[in-house]
Amino acid sequence: MARRANRRALIGALLLGAATAHAAAGETVACHVSYGGETKIVEARPTASPYTVAPIKFGSYLLFRIVFLNEPADLASIKLYTYAEHEDIDGRPLIHQATYAYPPVPAGRYGFTGLNHAYEPRYGLVLDYWCELRGSISK
């Protein structure tokens, strides 16, 4: 009898784990990025190699990058970066960075981040964004 109960508990745990892994596999971070009067939705899937995630260019001088780690649990996070791009400077100066625990807690109208404004001081540029966690990739 105890053996049968243990077997049922094991099967239940395996099914729950598989369902959780399947749900997480379809998740994306969707950021609503506004720059120059236009809003684009940029989506990112979970990655195992954060250093390979390329930034998305907005205008001539701004770049936005989403790094979504959902495992291992102790490193799970969502990191958002905004960089400036100047021809006379080597590299890309970081002008804004935000880190959120995974899974994030929705903060209301503007997803889990709230509405953010990244300011580039040389040219006076502003990039606005807010992000949400989606259950599957939008088409």
What do the PLM-derived regions correspond to, one by one?
Residues 13-23:
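Hydrophobic h-region of N-terminal signal peptides that target proteins for export
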Residues 26-139:
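Cysteine-centric segments in proteins
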Residues 1-11:
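Bacterial N-terminal signal peptides that target proteins for export
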